[in-house]
Amino acid sequence: MTGVYTTNTAEAVAYQLKHAKSNIAVVDSENQLQKLMSVRHKLPDLKHIVLYGEDQSYEDEVINWDDFLALGSRLGDEELRERLEGQAINQPAVICYTSGTTANPKGALLSQDNVTWTCASAVATYNLVEAEEVMISYLPVSHIVAQIADIWMIPSIGGTIHFADKDALKGSLLKTLTAVRPTRFGGLLH
């Protein structure tokens, strides 16, 4: 898994997805889809593009989120168990890329064990309560803090994640905080 910033150029997106050998890309808007399609020919490993938040149907390699989830629901418990058992602690879980301001982005590879240990350490350090924690996801998921907290840590303890609007950092976050009333709220120093 790797995250790509929505502000990245099409060329930066192509570089990162090719470097990561991504075979599935998830985009959250028609704009991001068009950006990706403009460099699609440079991505030989890419097999599918999933468009999140759109109900539209597409041809070929682009599918909407609901159709993507339906594909997963067809997997039986046995196949899922086999995939889980096929994972090893030293296998890659995520490649976290730098912003690439001065050159091509650099990728830092985090293993399954690294992510698991980091989540367990954060749960213990912050005394998170299993099945009771509620958090708001508002940082770009391409950021490692969002990946650890929103994708791995809170789900690993049965907590709840509320995804804020795309414009959360432009003013709507306070409204979301008031409505959701999270048990924890994290942020980054600027």
Label every model-predicted segment:
Residues 14, 81-84, 174:
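Short hydrophobic/charged patches on amphipathic alpha-helices used for structural packing
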Residues 25-37, 182-190:
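Adenylate-forming
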Residues 1-34, 107-109, 159-166:
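Short beta-strand->loop structural element characteristic of the AMP-binding/adenylate-forming
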Residues 116-134, 141-190:
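Conserved AMP-binding/adenylation subdomain of ANL enzymes
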Residues 25, 92, 98-101, 135, ...:
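Conserved S/T- and glycine-rich ATP-binding loop of Class I adenylate-forming
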Residues 73-97, 104, 128-134:
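Conserved pre-ATP/AMP-binding loop-to-beta segment of ANL
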Residues 31-89:
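ANL superfamily adenylate-forming
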Residues 93-119:
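Conserved AMP-binding A3 loop
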